[in-house]
Structure formats: C-alpha cells, structure tokens
Amino acid sequence: MWVERDGGQLCDWGKRKEIMRRVIISIIGVSLAVAAAGQDSQDQHQSFDVNVPQAPLPVLSDGRVMLAYELHITNFTRGKLQLMELRVLAGESGRTIADFRNQDLIDRISIVGAPAQSPTGSVVAPGARAIVFIELQLAPGERLSALRHELDYGLPDGTVSTLRPEATSVSMRPASVLGPPLRGGPWVAVHDPTWPSGHRRVTYTMGGKVRLPGRFAVDWVGTDAAGRISTGDPDHPSDSIGYNADVLAGADAEVAAVRDNMTESTSIQHNPAHVLGEGAGNFVALRLGPDRVAFYEHLRPGSIRVRAGEHVRKGQVIGSLGFSGDTTGPHLHLHVADCDQTLQCEGVPFTIEAMSLLGRYHNIADLGQHPWSTEVVRKPGSPEWPSYNVVVRFPSPLQVRSTHEASRVVLSNVSALGPAMHMPGQAHYEQQ
C-alpha cells in the first residue's frame, strides 16, 4: 500500500477505492428502488377498509343452513369509489357461494347517513361508509369455518380494481332452541332482509360501537284463515287478531330484565313516536345462557307476570301480546341477543321447535287483505328459524305440554352439544 501527498493531504488510495465502490453500489441500489417504486405505484392505490363486525353464525331455516352478516366498507380515499361486484367464497375450497352484482348488489347496500327511503346506489363518497347486508344459503351438508370475499370496485379514473380482504371466520356456536312463543295460530313471522328500515338493517351506535340487535328479529302478527288481522275497527288495537294472546317463555331461564310501565295508544294510526330506548315498549328479557338473552317486546300494559331475578319454566305465561312502544300494529317482537340491553347488543340466531309451516306472504302488503300462498306447507323435522314472512301454527296448550316433556328427554341426551343462542331487535313489523 502506498500514499501520496495531494494538497497537503495524505490519500490512502485503497480506502478511496473502497469508498468509490460503496458509492457506486448505493447509487445502483437507489436507482433500482426508484424503478421498483415507480412500477409498484402503477399497481398500488388506496381503497376501502373492510370489516365484518359480527362473525357469521349458522342457523337452519327453510330446511337449509343459512348465514346472515354484514360487510362494513369505508372509503378512506379522496375520490368516489363504486362497488361493482361482490363474490363470497368458501374459505377452504374456494367455491363461489354467492355472486352479487348490478341491482342485486345495490339492493344490499346501505350508505350510512343516507335517508332510509332513498336509493343509495353503489357509489361510496370519500369518508363515507357502506354496509352490505349478506344472506347466504349453504349447499346441503356444507360446513364452513371461514369465508373469503372478492370486491370489484371502480376508481375515479374509470379503471376497475379487485380487493381481497382477510378471511372471515364463521362461528360454530349452535343457535339457541326456543319453545313456541305463542299458542295456536295462524301467526305470520313478519320480517324481510330487503326492507330499508326493517329489523335486519337498523343499526345502533352506543358506547362507542355500532351494533345490529335485530339481525334475526321476528314480529309475530295474528291472522285468520282469510288473512285478516282485525275482527272489528282496524284502528282499535284491542280488535286486532292476536291482541292479548298469552306470551310463553321459550326456555327454562332467569328473568334478566322487565319493563311494564308504558301505556298503549288507543289508536293504531295515532300511536306517537317514542324516545330512543322506549321503542321496545313493555318487555321481558330471559337469560338463556352465557351471552344469550331472549327479548319479548311490545307487551300489553299490566300483563307481565314475572319479575327480574325470577326463574321461569319453558311454556310458562310471562305476559300478553300488546301494542306498547314503537309499532304499527299489535304484535309480539322476538329476538335473541348477546347481552341484556335492548339496543347495545348484537343479534344472534335462534330456532323454534314444534311449529308447522302453513305458507308464506310473498308480498306483505297482502297481509290483512288476502290469504297467504300455501306452497311451503310442511312440518320441519328439526327446529328452525322462521323464514321471511312465513305463516305458522304452534301447538295447542295440551300439545305444548307433551312437546315440553319430550324435549326434556331429548335435551338431557344432547346437552353436550353446546349452549343456546338468541337475538335482539326493535323496529316496525311492517315494511318501512
């Protein structure tokens, strides 16, 4: 090694060569990184934040296993994004379970903050959130532990991109099995996931979290063989078929909460609006098990026969069907939730045993005017969640007692299958 005096400085050419080598390598590395970043920038852009706040829970309905859940999709970009197509895939096999596009997708979208009665379309503005309501029917015998989603969306420049969020786990917890909430019939299970202001789509944000208590809520409306819902003045609650009918406990349970201090309007047409939290009217909440509470709402004033902390037996009369709270007509609201608060819980599925299916109203506007369609007449072999607007008949009091005795024997042999489950709600029983 040798050194040279240059301008008064000693230059170690070995070190100089090493420094130059490192500089060249650094320049090449930076150039490659810039080139790579330029290439990536052509493929990368901001998109949606996708969240599934409540894991899908399976339930038997219409003879098939179904799932009901929501995708919360928030636009964090500075431009409008358009939802174009949503595919739901089985997490294990990759099989396409559902493919929503065009009007079918638009009908499932609710833009947070938009008027409930106005069409929201599929365009999500910057900072806005869309909720996509999803109902799936699985293939016979199919069991899923996870779901995957593929979302095609349009960018402001007209290009289309595909978003593939992380897989969503499917809960394996079984639905709670309830006894009949009423006797006899016919009773119409009024609910429909497509109604903009129906239980299925009414969210509440309290305590810093958005929840959907009425995800599986059912409103039971009494009718007769001709499809009428009133035997006298249609504006008088007491003339409604089903008014004052006994409401039955669906399980051996502890009474978690009771409210019985609300009056009823004497006019259906002029029933006043109620403040948030009083829409359920008079109600009884039964604790079925860990994180599972059944709500029986809109009960007649003075009819509740139980108090908080008491224990009730399956089939025991707990109150009477009424017209208290926010409702467009006398009915029994039933849902199951994961806590004992009417609005601060997540709705979970439940099934009802010992009911016979008489038919269905394909257009709920026909209820009160015409008989139902009878093409779905059957008696389920297993407890089911009542499907949309089906008409059912429950056992008579004598049949209820015999059914309860038989179910105690069956349940004693299958207690290892796991705890029960339920769900919450609070909305009108008519299409909004």
Predicted regions span which residues?
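Terminal connector regions
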Residues: Q137-V177
